[in-house]
């Protein structure tokens, strides 16, 4: 196996959204989602929709949830996202109806090809079917 050469890493092909949108989401995520003092799920659901997420009815989002890009997220009706969940959705994540993503779960859409010296980014969507 060849050594990794981080200086040769290139993910210029990966475009998860505009820089301004990502920056705005960063602050909204910190203030309303990662903040343990905001227990109000309804506000979080509205903010997710505002940023392009498709969110069904009766969705409950607990405190300290980290979502990378809401515009790449779909949550079905009556699903729950538990405390300390990290949705690192570099590409589309689809969560079905009546699904519970329990406390501390991590949904990771990306990794790196450690077998290549260029450490290429690998991304694949996640689909969690109806509960």
Task: Tell me the role of every PLM-derived stretch.
Residues 1-53:
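Terminal amphipathic alpha-helical/low-complexity segments used for targeting or macromolecular assembly
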Residues 38-45, 65-75, 80-131:
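Flexible, glycine/small-residue-enriched loop-and-beta-strand segment within the central core
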Residues 56-58:
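N-terminal signal-anchor transmembrane helix
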